[in-house]
Amino acid sequence: MKEACSSSSHVPVSDSKYILKSELLSLLKTYNCYHEGRSFQLRHREEEGTLIIEGLLNIAWGLRRPIRLQMQDDRERVHLPSATWVPERLSYLQKEASPQDSKVPTEEPGTQPANKAEVSGDSSGALEGEEEEVPQLMRTKSDASCIIQRRSKSRAPSEAQKIRRHRFSINGHFYNHKTSVFTPAYGSVTNVRVNSTMTTQQVLTLLLNKFRVEDGPSEFALYTVHESGEQTKLKDCEYPLISRILHGPCEKIVKIFLMEADLSEEVPHDVAQYIKFEMPVLDSFVEKLKEEEEREIIKLTMKFQALRLTMLQRLEQLVEAK
């Protein structure tokens, strides 16, 4: 059966589940119609009889703990030579740079970040806070890829507190460039370019590399979360892009979330249907179930008491017959 399904007429959904290619193409057509005129439309092609679909896959952040980013880029930290750093040049730079300029990341001339962080469709985020008071150029593997740090004049206590914290906001997320800790806003969406042959582990690795996350893919998992609260983990052998197409294009109904592997668990449909009820309603459900349980207990007790009585009567009849 598996060999038959592995033919050119089927597309794998996991290592043991297949879908007809014609059915998948029909779902893909619906998916692209929903995203018509947008960059989330998917392209498809065939290579040696194998259907390959590729495009952007939206993934929502569902982390409960901050994640740690790599502090250093592939290159070493670049310090400006002390011989060329003279007071005249410092005063010249301070005149050239406005206070607002010191709050935004500046890119090195002629270079482009290897992986540009795309969160909720914004191309770049504002960095809120002041830099460290040491003149050097720091390159990090995050959205705050290049930060010029310079000397500054005396500041108000509130500004000094920001310097001590070294805490920035990147598109609504919090990033501490001293500890390299990143806290994505829950439910915010990023995306990665994938294809239908990439497994869950490969997509996880791609996403973590994009944000230069130090933790390995084994510490995270992808979940499909339904609007009802139903939550299903994508297995390592599954293909997230195929799963997205099968669940439909509307992310108000189903989203794919990145979560911690040790803090998340699946929520079956039977449990999910009770999640959104208020506590008083749930308490009333529990009371009704208790009442029903008590009625069933009484019913079963009476039934077996009647059976016991019948058996005792029969035993007495047998004894008398002897």
Curated annotation (Swiss-Prot):
<dbReference type="InterPro" id="IPR033622">
    <property type="entry name" value="RASSF4_RA"/>
</dbReference>
<dbReference type="Pfam" id="PF00788">
    <property type="entry name" value="RA"/>
</dbReference>
<dbReference type="InterPro" id="IPR011524">
    <property type="entry name" value="SARAH_dom"/>
</dbReference>
<dbReference type="InterPro" id="IPR029071">
    <property type="entry name" value="Ubiquitin-like_domsf"/>
</dbReference>
<keyword id="KW-0597">Phosphoprotein</keyword>
<dbReference type="InterPro" id="IPR000159">
    <property type="entry name" value="RA_dom"/>
</dbReference>
<dbReference type="GO" id="GO:0007165">
    <property type="term" value="P:signal transduction"/>
</dbReference>
<feature type="domain" description="Ras-associating">
    <location>
        <begin position="175"/>
        <end position="264"/>
    </location>
</feature>
<comment type="function">
    <text>Potential tumor suppressor. May act as a KRAS effector protein. May promote apoptosis and cell cycle arrest.</text>
</comment>
<keyword id="KW-0043">Tumor suppressor</keyword>
<dbReference type="Pfam" id="PF16517">
    <property type="entry name" value="Nore1-SARAH"/>
</dbReference>
<dbReference type="InterPro" id="IPR033614">
    <property type="entry name" value="RASSF1-6"/>
</dbReference>
<feature type="domain" description="SARAH">
    <location>
        <begin position="271"/>
        <end position="318"/>
    </location>
</feature>
<feature type="region of interest" description="Disordered">
    <location>
        <begin position="96"/>
        <end position="161"/>
    </location>
</feature>
<protein>
    <recommendedName>
        <fullName>Ras association domain-containing protein 4</fullName>
    </recommendedName>
</protein>
<comment type="subunit">
    <text>Interacts directly with activated KRAS in a GTP-dependent manner.</text>
</comment>
<keyword id="KW-0131">Cell cycle</keyword>
<feature type="modified residue" description="Phosphoserine">
    <location>
        <position position="142"/>
    </location>
</feature>
